[in-house]
Amino acid sequence: GGGIDLSVGATYALCQVIAMKMAITGDPVLAILVGVIIGIGVGAANGVITTFFRINSLIATLATSFVITGGAALITGGNLITNFAVTGYAAFARTQFLDVTTAAWTMIGVVIVLAIVLSRTIAGRYMYAAGSNAEASRLAGVRVQWIKLVTFALSGGAAALGGILDSSRVLSASSANGGTALTFTVLAGIVVGGTSILGGEGAVWRTVVGVLFIAIIGNGFTLLGWNPLYEQITLGVILLLAVGGDAWSRLRTG
């Protein structure tokens, strides 16, 4: 859709905090559903702010990320939420089928669905078109504002699902689990995977490759016992090179 969502890390944290608290005191299935719906709502709110109020997505989502992070911190009181008795909630990510966890199956399912939507449907083509040239798409009859709103809503829902799966796996949640570090790790994976930072170009499978590449780097630093600060520096350099490469490619192609 051509926008940048810097609130994914904050949404990730907020939704896992809400889902975890609800799972401790109530129905874990309802907790998961509510968490995902809240994520979609946050994303939709970002979409409304950026499209209908014409605020730059970078600024808008940066601002909402602070609001969301503050809200998550108020809910937790700045403390870690943990409860190893919520077995129903734990089953969401830990149950295995064919020796593969449901968390992995969920990721595979989401990837397949998004790949089909983006490459095989009219809605997917509209998303690429809106990101590539919003004005031309609008003149061609594409409802660009609604396409961008839906794209932001999907981003929020995906962030929420990721946060809930993570808290289900470790049976804990914290407002500090998201934030800038996670957001820029996500951005690095996406850009390294070949998705243009300006929109209109990319593929789901390439994004998966980019994210796996970034994850391998992170695991490598951990296994080698290297200073985490060097990992941040490395990710920053990788992100800069990837964005620079994208800009250079666009200049060459006119």
Language-model features and meaning:
Residues 1-27, 48-55, 187-205, 237, ...:
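Single transmembrane alpha-helix segments in multi-pass membrane proteins
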Residues 53, 57-121, 147-150, 169-179:
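Transmembrane helix-bundle core of multi-pass membrane transporters
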Residues 113-153:
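Membrane-helix/interface signature in polytopic inner-membrane proteins
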Residues 26-65, 109, 209-210:
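Alpha-helical transmembrane segments within multi-pass membrane transporters and channels
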Residues 65-72, 106-117, 152-163, 189-195, ...:
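Hydrophobic core segments of alpha-helical transmembrane domains in multi-pass membrane transport
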Residues 143-167, 184:
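Transmembrane alpha-helices
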Residues 159, 170, 174-235:
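Transmembrane alpha-helical segments in multi-pass inner-membrane proteins
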Residues 113, 132, 139-146, 169, ...:
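Cytosolic-side transmembrane-helix boundaries in multi-pass membrane proteins
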